[in-house]
Amino acid sequence: MAFRGWRPPPPPLLLLLLWVTGQAAPVAGLGSDAELQIERRFVPDECPRTVRSGDFVRYHYVGTFPDGQKFDSSYDRDSTFNVFVGKGQLITGMDQALVGMCVNERRFVKIPPKLAYGNEGVSGVIPPNSVLHFDVLLMDIWNSEDQVQIHTYFKPPSCPRTIQVSDFVRYHYNGTFLDGTLFDSSHNRMKTYDTYVGIGWLIPGMDKGLLGMCVGEKRIITIPPFLAYGEDGDGKDIPGQASLVFDVALLDLHNPKDSISIENKVVPENCERISQSGDFLRYHYNGTLLDGTLFDSSYSRNRTFDTYIGQGYVIPGMDEGLLGVCIGEKRRIVVPPHLGYGEEGRGNIPGSAVLVFDIHVIDFHNPSDSISITSHYKPPDCSVLSKKGDYLKYHYNASLLDGTLLDSTWNLGKTYNIVLGSGQVVLGMDMGLREMCVGEKRTVIIPPHLGYGEAGVDGEVPGSAVLVFDIELLELVAGLPEGYMFIWNGEVSPNLFEEIDKDGNGEVLLEEFSEYIHAQVASGKGKLAPGFDAELIVKNMFTNQDRNGDGKVTAEEFKLKDQEAKHDEL
């Protein structure tokens, strides 16, 4: 509401209450019918202003003779009577009777003939020497010297910025006349009024009345008609010469020249790396409007918001605001609408809304990242280093970059055991355990593409999470050469088949084969690959020798590894 379109008022129209022939006679005589009588039938509790000579008023009235016969009424015309007081535009009695009235005050006025139409009357309407009774209700009052009146009844404790010329604002309002009659309300439309200030988009009084407001401030702006819709009104709901009262609550404020603003809330003391364009971030946020209204929160979904930055995956203001953050940092990012969701808005975000994001950076990485290894302790003798195929026993604590503990073997009371290079752990962990000696302690940081990827582990590891493992290697059993599951520690007997075939029937069954291999391992003559199921290894070795798959191995089928490279047995 409050569009431009006023013009200076023309000379007042003179209706019935003008004198007919010159000035009224001076006040004289005594008695109830000889003097002006005023009865104040209703006076409002609040009366910030009363009518003075020179003021312009709008009022309703009913005019009757002493016997009750009506001769005129503004209500019949469905329009107030609008006139200056004390400038000779009214009969003298009415000029005097209106002085001192409050808006919404009701007066019953008895005007003697000498202060009305005298001994001439008004032909066909008011007989000569008539006493006139007027029931008057004052609707509006203003003066040509008036300016916009501002009353602030709430101002937030913090007011970092106020409305300036050319700012764009979003506000709610109730628009009433001075008598309290509502003519318009943004609340009824459940939508703010959005406009530029000070560039002619509003009536002059509202342009002036909004200047200096803070977001969250509430003020009452009273505007005289010559700074509003003037003599003609708006042609719909606002009559001519009406003073307007706007009860305004400012929700939002920005300037088209604004960029984002950043307020650092918490910055970790140790910040080894800051985010750059192309990084992938995981962060929590609360998204609010400038007035504090929450429109979205990652916390309510119990899941971080995960995205690349600097590549257009998020609104431009967030793309910029997330650059240069540390892991664990908390900051507030204020995004003007032209760097947010623009004039259209999105979902429950209104158009032209300034957005406030309170973010907490959980982690970030770059797709080009490899693992990071920091060794905290190495024993004096650290000559035997882990390699592919070795069997390792180690303890670990697994956490996210923000310190959230995911898992711990210490809490479980047992080590984690793997064969290095066998695919038993994620690739980043496999890489991080290499070239480590027994007793060494190290921290391994694993980016998600070398960890559990975008999917994570349901209920355990978030998707796209960087993982931190604090590791202590407790035991290392050297593995076998690549491709071997069993090796001899010494010379191989030339009569190997005969030694396995104890019953000498020319064929070896699985039971005989398994018993022999385990005996060689027990005596130290042979070695099975550590970390694997021994029975499965032996069975696999036997199956490889059983060429025709009949469940037994003959001398013709039996061959050593170096005799046929494609098999991993013996």
Curated annotation (Swiss-Prot):
Function: PPIases accelerate the folding of proteins during protein synthesis.
Binding site for Ca(2+) 1: 501, 503, 505, 507, 512
Keyword Metal-binding applies: yes
Name the record gives this protein: Peptidyl-prolyl cis-trans isomerase FKBP9
Keyword line: Calcium, Endoplasmic reticulum, Glycoprotein, Isomerase, Metal-binding, Phosphoprotein, Repeat, Rotamase, Signal
Residues where Ca(2+) 2 binds: 546, 548, 550, 552, 557
Sequence motif: Prevents secretion from ER, positions: 567-570
Regulation: Inhibited by FK506.
Lineage: Eukaryota, Metazoa, Chordata, Craniata, Vertebrata
Positions annotated with a glycan in the UniProt record: 174, 286, 302, 397
Alphabetical GO biological process terms: protein folding
PANTHER family: PEPTIDYL-PROLYL CIS-TRANS ISOMERASE FKBP9, PEPTIDYLPROLYL ISOMERASE
Record PROSITE patterns: EF_HAND_1 (PS00018), EF_HAND_2 (PS50222), ER_TARGET (PS00014), FKBP_PPIASE (PS50059)
Main location: endoplasmic reticulum
Domain EF-hand, residue spans: 488-523, 533-568
Domain PPIase FKBP-type: 54-142, 166-254, 278-365, 389-477
